[in-house]
Amino acid sequence: MTKKIEKGDLVTVFVTVWDLRDHIVDQTGEEGVTLRAGAEDVFPRMDQALLKHKEGDRFDLVLEPEESFGDFDENLVHLVPVDKLGVENPKKGMRFSHIPGVPVDDGRGYIITDVGGGMAVLDGNHPYAGWTLRFEIQVMRVELVEEGDIAESDIFIPDFLKVANDSVKEEAEDRLEV
């Protein structure tokens, strides 16, 4: 009998993320991604759902925006003169850790979503903010690991499996308590 996932186990999962039109919007590589169950490295509902499964299981999890990347916030979209960005020839897709002249220090990154007429649109929302997403999860491997056997720096969680920011994480955790 295959053991059920427990808090602290190292779990390797293959994840495919779908939008509501059944388009794949992201997925892990073939090797999957390894995370520590119950360590709150992924969305709270995903973390909780993993604890109900075992190696070899496949399951779907639908997350609303407030359980994953948050609602789209227009206040996080800024129109900035390109000469204030400090880069030559800014292009769509470029990332910035902050916006010059905008007092924001929450660790949020910004991405240029449009450039034209000497101006750039920088968006601090996660690309999937406001989206309801379906996560198709396959549990590939479960390993019992003793405390201290693996450093947290050895675990890499892709952005599409992590809560976008602390306020979204708190809201998602609150929904679990209801």
Predicted regions and their residues:
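FKBP-type peptidyl-prolyl cis-trans isomerases
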Residues: 1-178
